[in-house]
Amino acid sequence: QKIAKGQWKPIRDVNEIDPKDGYDVISTIDVYVQDIAHHALLESLQKNNAEHGCVVVMETKTGQIRAISNLGKDPKSGNYYETINYAVSESHEPGSTFKLVDLIALLDDNKVDTSKVYDSRGGVVTYRGKRVVDSHKGGYGKISLGQGFEKSSNTIMVQAVYENYNSNPQQFVDRINNMGLNKPLGLPFKGEGKPKIPQPSDASWSAISLPWMAFGYGVSVTPLQTLTLYNAIANNGEMVKPLFVSEIKEWNKTIKKYNKQVINPKICSISTVNKVKALLENVVKRGTGEKLYSKDFSMAGKTGTAQAN
Protein backbone atom coordinates (compact mmCIF):
# COMPACT_ATOMS: atom_id res chain seq x y z
CA GLN A 1 0.00 0.00 0.00
CA LYS A 2 1.36 3.38 -1.02
CA ILE A 3 1.36 5.94 1.78
CA ALA A 4 2.60 9.50 2.28
CA LYS A 5 5.69 10.79 0.50
CA GLY A 6 5.61 7.93 -2.02
CA GLN A 7 6.54 5.29 0.54
CA TRP A 8 5.15 1.77 0.64
CA LYS A 9 4.09 -0.43 3.50
CA PRO A 10 3.16 -4.13 3.55
CA ILE A 11 -0.57 -4.77 3.80
CA ARG A 12 -0.15 -7.99 5.77
CA ASP A 13 2.21 -6.78 8.45
CA VAL A 14 1.73 -8.99 11.53
CA ASN A 15 2.52 -5.97 13.71
CA GLU A 16 -0.29 -3.90 12.26
CA ILE A 17 -3.23 -3.31 14.60
CA ASP A 18 -6.59 -2.63 13.06
CA PRO A 19 -8.17 0.66 14.12
CA LYS A 20 -10.83 0.42 16.77
CA ASP A 21 -13.55 2.89 17.70
CA GLY A 22 -12.92 4.61 21.01
CA TYR A 23 -15.28 4.74 23.97
CA ASP A 24 -17.89 7.45 24.38
CA VAL A 25 -17.49 9.50 27.57
CA ILE A 26 -20.86 10.79 28.78
CA SER A 27 -20.39 13.95 30.85
CA THR A 28 -22.72 15.18 33.57
CA ILE A 29 -22.99 18.61 31.92
CA ASP A 30 -26.46 19.82 30.96
CA VAL A 31 -25.89 21.94 27.84
CA TYR A 32 -28.88 24.18 28.57
CA VAL A 33 -27.79 24.90 32.15
CA GLN A 34 -24.22 25.34 30.89
CA ASP A 35 -25.30 27.95 28.36
CA ILE A 36 -27.23 29.94 30.96
CA ALA A 37 -24.41 29.75 33.52
CA HIS A 38 -21.75 30.75 30.99
CA HIS A 39 -23.59 33.84 29.76
CA ALA A 40 -24.60 34.89 33.29
CA LEU A 41 -20.93 34.74 34.31
CA LEU A 42 -19.81 36.66 31.24
CA GLU A 43 -22.39 39.39 31.85
CA SER A 44 -21.36 39.75 35.49
CA LEU A 45 -17.64 39.90 34.68
CA GLN A 46 -18.19 42.55 32.02
CA LYS A 47 -20.43 44.61 34.30
CA ASN A 48 -17.87 44.62 37.11
CA ASN A 49 -14.77 44.76 34.89
CA ALA A 50 -13.47 41.74 36.80
CA GLU A 51 -10.20 39.97 36.07
CA HIS A 52 -11.67 36.49 36.15
CA GLY A 53 -14.43 34.38 37.62
CA CYS A 54 -16.13 31.01 37.63
CA VAL A 55 -19.55 29.46 38.14
CA VAL A 56 -20.39 25.84 38.96
CA VAL A 57 -23.80 24.16 39.22
CA MET A 58 -23.91 20.94 41.25
CA GLU A 59 -26.81 18.52 41.60
CA THR A 60 -27.39 18.25 45.34
CA LYS A 61 -28.07 14.55 45.84
CA THR A 62 -25.59 13.08 43.36
CA GLY A 63 -22.79 15.65 43.17
CA GLN A 64 -23.06 15.65 39.37
CA ILE A 65 -21.71 18.88 37.86
CA ARG A 66 -24.40 20.24 35.55
CA ALA A 67 -22.49 23.36 34.51
CA ILE A 68 -19.01 24.79 34.95
CA SER A 69 -17.66 27.93 33.33
CA ASN A 70 -14.34 29.70 33.87
CA LEU A 71 -13.54 33.01 32.22
CA GLY A 72 -10.46 35.20 32.42
CA LYS A 73 -9.87 38.63 30.93
CA ASP A 74 -7.31 39.17 28.19
CA PRO A 75 -5.45 42.34 29.31
CA LYS A 76 -4.79 43.34 25.70
CA SER A 77 -8.19 42.89 24.08
CA GLY A 78 -10.36 43.17 27.18
CA ASN A 79 -12.31 40.11 26.03
CA TYR A 80 -13.01 37.08 28.21
CA TYR A 81 -11.80 33.60 27.36
CA GLU A 82 -11.76 30.19 29.01
CA THR A 83 -8.08 29.47 29.58
CA ILE A 84 -7.76 28.41 33.23
CA ASN A 85 -10.05 26.15 35.25
CA TYR A 86 -10.33 28.51 38.22
CA ALA A 87 -13.08 26.48 39.90
CA VAL A 88 -10.77 23.49 40.24
CA SER A 89 -7.27 24.93 40.34
CA GLU A 90 -7.44 28.27 42.13
CA SER A 91 -7.00 27.91 45.88
CA HIS A 92 -7.75 31.31 47.42
CA GLU A 93 -8.97 32.98 50.60
CA PRO A 94 -12.74 32.42 50.71
CA GLY A 95 -13.61 35.46 52.79
CA SER A 96 -17.11 35.55 54.25
CA THR A 97 -18.27 32.32 52.62
CA PHE A 98 -16.07 30.62 55.23
CA LYS A 99 -18.36 31.89 58.01
CA LEU A 100 -20.51 28.83 57.35
CA VAL A 101 -17.67 26.82 58.92
CA ASP A 102 -17.83 29.05 62.03
CA LEU A 103 -21.53 28.49 62.38
CA ILE A 104 -21.35 24.71 61.94
CA ALA A 105 -18.53 24.41 64.48
CA LEU A 106 -20.14 26.64 67.11
CA LEU A 107 -23.51 24.90 66.88
CA ASP A 108 -22.26 21.33 66.61
CA ASP A 109 -19.84 21.78 69.50
CA ASN A 110 -22.71 23.22 71.57
CA LYS A 111 -20.73 26.39 72.23
CA VAL A 112 -23.55 28.86 71.61
CA ASP A 113 -26.96 29.10 70.02
CA THR A 114 -27.91 31.41 67.19
CA SER A 115 -29.89 33.58 69.62
CA LYS A 116 -26.84 34.62 71.68
CA VAL A 117 -26.31 38.39 71.49
CA TYR A 118 -22.97 40.01 70.70
CA ASP A 119 -21.93 43.66 70.52
CA SER A 120 -20.40 44.64 67.18
CA ARG A 121 -18.50 47.39 69.04
CA GLY A 122 -18.98 50.09 66.48
CA GLY A 123 -17.90 47.79 63.69
CA VAL A 124 -14.31 47.33 64.87
CA VAL A 125 -12.65 44.74 67.12
CA THR A 126 -8.89 44.51 67.68
CA TYR A 127 -6.64 41.50 68.25
CA ARG A 128 -2.96 42.09 69.00
CA GLY A 129 -3.13 45.48 67.35
CA LYS A 130 -4.81 44.17 64.19
CA ARG A 131 -8.30 45.44 63.41
CA VAL A 132 -11.24 43.39 62.21
CA VAL A 133 -13.73 45.74 60.55
CA ASP A 134 -17.33 45.36 59.41
CA SER A 135 -18.15 46.40 55.86
CA HIS A 136 -21.11 48.33 57.29
CA LYS A 137 -19.59 51.46 58.82
CA GLY A 138 -20.41 51.78 62.50
CA GLY A 139 -21.30 48.12 62.88
CA TYR A 140 -24.69 46.72 63.80
CA GLY A 141 -24.97 47.43 67.50
CA LYS A 142 -26.01 44.47 69.63
CA ILE A 143 -27.39 41.63 67.52
CA SER A 144 -27.69 37.86 67.76
CA LEU A 145 -25.19 35.43 66.27
CA GLY A 146 -27.81 34.43 63.72
CA GLN A 147 -28.33 38.04 62.66
CA GLY A 148 -24.57 38.51 62.53
CA PHE A 149 -24.35 35.65 60.05
CA GLU A 150 -27.21 36.99 57.95
CA LYS A 151 -25.56 40.42 57.80
CA SER A 152 -22.11 38.86 57.36
CA SER A 153 -20.71 40.80 60.31
CA ASN A 154 -16.99 40.17 60.68
CA THR A 155 -16.93 41.49 64.25
CA ILE A 156 -19.78 39.26 65.45
CA MET A 157 -18.49 36.04 63.88
CA VAL A 158 -14.89 36.65 64.95
CA GLN A 159 -15.90 37.37 68.55
CA ALA A 160 -17.99 34.20 68.69
CA VAL A 161 -15.17 32.01 67.39
CA TYR A 162 -12.43 33.66 69.46
CA GLU A 163 -14.46 33.58 72.67
CA ASN A 164 -15.19 29.86 72.34
CA TYR A 165 -12.03 28.45 70.77
CA ASN A 166 -9.11 30.67 71.79
CA SER A 167 -8.25 28.39 74.71
CA ASN A 168 -8.32 25.35 72.40
CA PRO A 169 -7.95 26.38 68.74
CA GLN A 170 -7.25 22.79 67.76
CA GLN A 171 -10.92 21.98 68.42
CA PHE A 172 -11.95 24.55 65.80
CA VAL A 173 -9.36 23.33 63.30
CA ASP A 174 -10.45 19.73 63.88
CA ARG A 175 -13.97 20.76 62.85
CA ILE A 176 -12.59 22.18 59.61
CA ASN A 177 -10.60 19.01 58.98
CA ASN A 178 -13.68 16.88 59.68
CA MET A 179 -15.48 18.75 56.90
CA GLY A 180 -12.71 17.67 54.54
CA LEU A 181 -11.51 21.19 53.76
CA ASN A 182 -7.90 20.39 54.65
CA LYS A 183 -7.30 18.11 51.67
CA PRO A 184 -8.03 18.13 47.93
CA LEU A 185 -11.25 16.58 46.67
CA GLY A 186 -9.25 14.01 44.71
CA LEU A 187 -10.66 14.85 41.29
CA PRO A 188 -9.73 12.53 38.39
CA PHE A 189 -7.63 15.07 36.50
CA LYS A 190 -4.50 17.14 36.99
CA GLY A 191 -4.29 20.66 38.30
CA GLU A 192 -6.52 20.56 41.38
CA GLY A 193 -5.59 23.34 43.79
CA LYS A 194 -4.34 22.45 47.25
CA PRO A 195 -6.20 23.89 50.24
CA LYS A 196 -4.37 25.55 53.11
CA ILE A 197 -5.75 25.24 56.62
CA PRO A 198 -3.38 26.57 59.32
CA GLN A 199 -2.73 24.21 62.23
CA PRO A 200 -1.93 25.35 65.80
CA SER A 201 1.22 23.23 65.60
CA ASP A 202 2.52 25.24 62.63
CA ALA A 203 5.50 27.51 63.27
CA SER A 204 3.59 30.30 61.53
CA TRP A 205 0.58 30.05 63.89
CA SER A 206 0.11 33.29 65.84
CA ALA A 207 -2.32 35.04 68.16
CA ILE A 208 -4.26 36.41 65.17
CA SER A 209 -4.49 33.13 63.24
CA LEU A 210 -7.78 32.05 64.84
CA PRO A 211 -9.67 35.37 64.53
CA TRP A 212 -8.48 35.79 60.94
CA MET A 213 -9.64 32.28 60.03
CA ALA A 214 -13.07 33.12 61.45
CA PHE A 215 -13.79 35.52 58.60
CA GLY A 216 -12.06 33.55 55.87
CA TYR A 217 -8.50 34.89 55.82
CA GLY A 218 -5.28 32.98 56.29
CA VAL A 219 -7.04 29.93 54.86
CA SER A 220 -7.28 28.85 51.22
CA VAL A 221 -9.75 26.57 49.45
CA THR A 222 -10.89 26.15 45.86
CA PRO A 223 -14.30 27.36 44.66
CA LEU A 224 -15.27 23.73 44.08
CA GLN A 225 -14.44 22.90 47.71
CA THR A 226 -16.63 25.76 48.90
CA LEU A 227 -19.46 24.53 46.69
CA THR A 228 -19.04 20.97 47.98
CA LEU A 229 -19.35 22.22 51.58
CA TYR A 230 -22.50 24.24 50.91
CA ASN A 231 -23.95 21.37 48.91
CA ALA A 232 -23.50 19.14 51.97
CA ILE A 233 -25.80 21.41 53.98
CA ALA A 234 -28.39 21.33 51.19
CA ASN A 235 -27.97 17.54 51.23
CA ASN A 236 -28.79 17.28 54.95
CA GLY A 237 -25.18 16.87 56.05
CA GLU A 238 -24.00 14.32 53.49
CA MET A 239 -20.95 15.55 51.57
CA VAL A 240 -20.62 14.09 48.08
CA LYS A 241 -17.74 14.29 45.63
CA PRO A 242 -18.20 16.37 42.48
CA LEU A 243 -18.77 14.13 39.45
CA PHE A 244 -17.97 15.20 35.89
CA VAL A 245 -18.57 11.88 34.08
CA SER A 246 -21.76 9.84 34.43
CA GLU A 247 -20.78 6.81 32.33
CA ILE A 248 -18.56 5.37 29.61
CA LYS A 249 -20.17 3.64 26.64
CA GLU A 250 -19.17 1.56 23.64
CA TRP A 251 -21.72 1.33 20.84
CA ASN A 252 -24.54 2.34 23.22
CA LYS A 253 -23.46 -0.31 25.70
CA THR A 254 -22.52 0.96 29.15
CA ILE A 255 -18.96 -0.08 30.00
CA LYS A 256 -18.74 1.77 33.31
CA LYS A 257 -21.20 3.82 35.33
CA TYR A 258 -20.12 6.43 37.87
CA ASN A 259 -22.36 6.59 40.91
CA LYS A 260 -22.50 9.02 43.81
CA GLN A 261 -19.34 9.05 45.91
CA VAL A 262 -19.78 10.02 49.56
CA ILE A 263 -16.88 11.95 51.10
CA ASN A 264 -18.47 12.31 54.53
CA PRO A 265 -21.89 10.85 55.36
CA LYS A 266 -22.44 13.38 58.16
CA ILE A 267 -20.44 16.61 58.45
CA CYS A 268 -22.62 17.72 61.37
CA SER A 269 -25.83 16.86 63.22
CA ILE A 270 -29.21 17.22 61.53
CA SER A 271 -30.11 19.79 64.21
CA THR A 272 -27.18 21.95 63.11
CA VAL A 273 -28.07 21.41 59.45
CA ASN A 274 -31.61 22.66 60.01
CA LYS A 275 -30.50 25.77 61.92
CA VAL A 276 -27.89 26.60 59.30
CA LYS A 277 -30.35 26.06 56.45
CA ALA A 278 -32.77 28.54 58.03
CA LEU A 279 -30.05 31.18 58.34
CA LEU A 280 -28.84 30.63 54.77
CA GLU A 281 -32.41 31.20 53.62
CA ASN A 282 -32.58 34.38 55.71
CA VAL A 283 -29.38 35.66 54.06
CA VAL A 284 -31.34 35.80 50.81
CA LYS A 285 -34.64 36.92 52.31
CA ARG A 286 -33.39 39.77 54.51
CA GLY A 287 -29.60 39.69 54.69
CA THR A 288 -26.71 40.56 52.41
CA GLY A 289 -28.17 38.54 49.54
CA GLU A 290 -31.64 40.09 49.56
CA LYS A 291 -31.22 41.53 46.05
CA LEU A 292 -31.49 37.97 44.76
CA TYR A 293 -34.70 37.16 46.61
CA SER A 294 -37.72 36.07 44.63
CA LYS A 295 -41.04 34.66 45.83
CA ASP A 296 -41.01 32.37 42.81
CA PHE A 297 -38.03 30.30 43.95
CA SER A 298 -36.74 28.62 47.08
CA MET A 299 -33.26 30.00 47.66
CA ALA A 300 -30.50 29.94 50.25
CA GLY A 301 -26.92 31.15 50.12
CA LYS A 302 -24.10 33.25 51.48
CA THR A 303 -22.36 36.30 50.10
CA GLY A 304 -18.61 36.63 50.19
CA THR A 305 -16.38 39.61 49.52
CA ALA A 306 -12.59 39.47 49.42
CA GLN A 307 -10.40 42.38 50.46
CA ALA A 308 -7.05 43.30 48.99
CA ASN A 309 -5.29 44.15 52.24
Language-model regions: role of each:
Residues 2-16, 20, 29, 53-91, ...:
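Beta-lactam-recognizing serine transpeptidase/beta-lactamase-like catalytic domain environment
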Residues 23-33:
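Conserved beta-strand/loop elements of the cytosolic catalytic core of P-type E1-E2 ATPases, chiefly
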Residues 41, 45-46, 180:
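Short regulatory alpha-helical segment in sensory/regulatory domains of signaling proteins that mediates
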Residues 44-51, 208:
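Flexible, solvent-exposed loop/hinge segments and secondary-structure transition points
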